[in-house]
Structure formats: structure tokens, C-alpha cells
Amino acid sequence: NERHLDDIEQGMIRTPGAFDEPRIHIALVCASIGCPMLRNDAYTAERLEAQLEDGMRRFFSDRTRNRYDASSGTLRVSKLFDWYAKDFESGHAGFASLAATFAKYADRLADTPEAQARIRSGDYRLEFLDYDWMLNDAR
């Protein structure tokens, strides 16, 4: 019985009731420039919670993929949050909405306390960045 990676992600992992974990989008990456960076270590059951949380914090800290422009009040985030919005609005793993997700990681999305406060209060215009499908070279 053959399976491809999309079957595993969409048909097994994202199936409602299977794992109900929105942070999976930080772990399952296609190695394109638009994806979160690959980890240097393997995911393990013992460390999975910490690894997923670390992945979210690292992804939101990456200004090429997510950023807040204080001058325009615009939060520009990865297209992943557009494509998988419902996963972050499901209430699973403490994620009830995109706004709540961004508020949780405001300290990673913005550099100043004022900008972080605006994100936490939802006082921003949201834009999704274009997704870069080019292969992410090894660094």
C-alpha cells in the first residue's frame, strides 16, 4: 500500500481527532524557502511538546517569513496561516483563533513593547506573504 507525504499529512495527521495539533505545520515542512526551517534534531515523543513550541517561536522570529511593520500597523505572516487557518481556530492545543495565536507569540513577531501590545490587542491589519516554493538550500 503506497502512500506519499501529502497522504500522511492530510489523510492521517490532520484528520480530525487524530492528533488535533495545529503546530504540526511547523514540523511537517516541504523544504521550500516559504516553509519553517528544518530542525537539526529529530522529533521525539519525549521532547515533542518542547520541540513544537520551540519551532513556533523560531518561525515567528524569522522576519523573512513573519513580521510586523509598526509604521503601517501591518502584521505580515506566512501564507501557511492562511492555508491552515482553521487548524489554528479549532481550539486544539490552546489555539482558538489566528488573532490569539499571533497574540501568544507577539514577543517574537514584534521588537518593541508597543508593537507587541498592538499585536496582543488585535490592533493591526493582517496580510499573508506570498509563498516561496523554491527549494531551501542547505546552510
Residue ranges and their predicted role:
Residues 1-139:
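C-terminal region detector
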